[in-house]
Regions:
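Active-site-adjacent mobile loop/cap segments within catalytic or ligand-binding domains
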Residues: 89, 95, 100-103, 108-123, ...
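Active-site/substrate-binding loop(s) of hydrolase catalytic cores
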Residues: 1-115, 169-179
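Gly/Ser/Thr-rich active-site loops/lids in small-molecule metabolic enzymes
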Residues: 118-137
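Active-site neighborhood of phospho(di)ester-bond hydrolases with catalytic His/Asp-centered motifs
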Residues: 101-104, 138-145
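Intrinsically disordered or highly flexible coil/loop and linker segments, enriched in small
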Residues: 60-61, 142, 204
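Surface-exposed loop/turn and secondary-structure junction residues enriched for glycine/proline
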Residues: 54, 58, 114, 132, ...
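Short, well-ordered coil/turn elements that cap or connect secondary structure elements
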Residues: 46, 136, 162-164
Length: 205
């Protein structure tokens, strides 16, 4: 296990595979504000930037920004890749050259898998990974609308568009974030077999 700032990356070695698990990379915003009841829906980091709107894809300059300033959600930041959390993930991906990425969020029991900027090969792998997740969890597959993904600036968009790395984003939990802790056991039971089967798929087994 290595420690990087306030985050930890766990290196789990089993035969020819290694899984790097990165805990929440935008935790200081919520932790600093949860004591204020009005801010319990805070999604952005402490700078008021939505990390999932901050990745430097080709579409970032044209991405609509309804907030236009630091706030609790959706603000894309003053520049692409401006935030330390974004930079951390970019550096990690560039250094490790992952074969695939499984990205977990909380809210909705759905799986985001497609991207109109992904190559046919990456898109096919995205779909295969999504089918594996759905088989374990029963979550619904969702393809972002064309207008919504045209100028995508999230982690998934960056992986598909700029890096060509197969990936899916899995939204766990019922209701809106923060998902109640009472759901942890059911979420775990639904998802516990996902990672092993994703690894088998990537290895072609």
């Amino acid at each position: 296990m290595e420690t990087n700032g306030n985050s930890k990356v766990f290196f789990l070695t089993k035969q020819e595979t290694r899984e790097d698990i990165v805990p929440e990379r935008s935790h200081e915003g919520p932790e600093s504000l949860y004591s204020n009841h009005w801010a319990n829906k805070w999604k952005n980091n402490l700078n008021g930037v939505d990390i999932n709107h901050n990745f430097p894809t080709q579409g970032w300059p044209n991405r609509a920004d309804s907030r236009k300033r630091p706030c609790n959600e959706f603000y894309k930041g003053a520049s692409a890749g401006s935030e330390s959390e974004t930079q951390y993930l970019i550096t990690l991906v560039n250094n490790e050259n992952f074969d695939a990425v499984l990205n977990y969020h909380t809210q909705g029991q759905i799986i985001y898998w497609s991207n109109q900027h992904a190559s046919a090969d990456v898109l096919a792998k995205d779909r295969a990974m999504a089918d594996i997740v759905a088989a374990h969890t029963g979550y619904k597959l969702v393809a972002p609308e064309a207008d919504g993904s045209k100028y995508g600036t999230g982690f998934k968009d960056w992986l598909d568009w700029e890096k060509g790395i197969p990936n899916v984003t899995v939204e766990v939990g019922i209701g809106t974030s923060p998902v109640p802790e009472t759901q942890i056991e059911s979420i775990w039971q639904q998802n516990t077999g996902v990672l092993p089967d994703i690894v088998k798929y990537i290895l072609g087994k």
